[in-house]
UniProtKB/Swiss-Prot annotation:
SUPFAM superfamilies: Immunoglobulin
Organism: Homo sapiens (Human)
Sugar attachment sites: N93
Quaternary structure, from the entry: Alpha-beta TR is a heterodimer composed of an alpha and beta chain; disulfide-linked. The alpha-beta TR is associated with the transmembrane signaling CD3 coreceptor proteins to form the TR-CD3 (TcR or TCR). The assembly of alpha-beta TR heterodimers with CD3 occurs in the endoplasmic reticulum where a single alpha-beta TR heterodimer associates with one CD3D-CD3E heterodimer, one CD3G-CD3E heterodimer and one CD247 homodimer forming a stable octameric structure. CD3D-CD3E and CD3G-CD3E heterodimers preferentially associate with TR alpha and TR beta chains, respectively.
Protein name according to UniProt: T cell receptor beta variable 2
InterPro entries linked to this entry: Ig-like_dom, Ig-like_dom_sf, Ig-like_fold, Ig_V-set, TCR_beta_variable
GO cellular-component term (any): T cell receptor complex
Keywords from the UniProt entry: Adaptive immunity, Cell membrane, Disulfide bond, Glycoprotein, Immunity, Immunoglobulin domain, Membrane, Receptor, Signal, T cell receptor
GO biological process terms held by the UniProt record: adaptive immune response; cell surface receptor signaling pathway
Cellular location(s): Cell membrane
Length: 115
């Protein structure tokens, strides 16, 4: 009986996790040549007002890039230079643009949102 209860609790937690709203990011992966422009799109949770971009270079820690609120950059890191830009063009998607990619831009990019 105890084993059944534990299995039921785990299943319930997994099921609850699947129904939570989530942030969607496209494309899921991008391969490009150096010097090309890349646009990464993020669809945040609908009622969220704050948006964030992070990146993680292979073998390194996750780095904060920029936060965005009320259609303006609210905070940015030192690595967020003129090569990068963010915008929320249609009021729902939140984009990160890398104007001219360099080898050191090779990384996993993550978006997030909060209320």
């Amino acid at each position: 009986m105890d084993t059944w209860l534990v299995c039921w609790a785990i299943f319930s937690l997994l099921k609850a996790g699947l129904t939570e709203p989530e942030v969607t990011q496209t494309p899921s992966h991008q391969v490009t040549q150096m010097g090309q422009e890349v646009i990464l799109r993020c669809v945040p949770i609908s009622n969220h007002l704050y948006f964030y971009w992070y990146r993680q270079i292979l073998g390194q820690k996750v780095e904060f890039l920029v936060s965005f609120y009320n259609n303006e950059i609210s905070e940015k890191s030192e690595i967020f230079d003129d090569q990068f830009s963010v915008e929320r063009p249609d009021g729902s998607n939140f984009t990160l643009k890398i104007r001219s990619t360099k080898l050191e831009d090779s990384a996993m990019y993550f978006c997030a949102s909060s209320e």
